[in-house]
Amino acid sequence: MSQYMILIYEDEAGYENATPELLGEVMEAHNQFAAGVEQLGGKLMGGAALQPGTTATSLRGSDVTDGPFVETKEVLGGYYLVDAPDLDTALAVARTVPARFGGVEVRPVMTFE
């Protein structure tokens, strides 16, 4: 099995005025995603939601800047790390990630021997 990082990019504006009901729906969708990974041939190794992009601090050399590197509508909001036998399986898993206000990126994790 190989590891794949599923990066979740979303427009944070979708959550700015979110009701408790919407936030509950989002959490339930992520719980259902986590429960279904093994049925698709993968194994969920970890994951987390990130604080809003406004809380980011970026470093470039000795320069420290508040906020993310790039001004963009969609920001990295969370990730999942999955074990999967191949990229096709990782993509099948990624298609089920609830990214209501954006999309996902799948990247293989490098291994060093």
Segment roles from a protein language model:
Residues 1-113:
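Conserved, structured core segments of small domains
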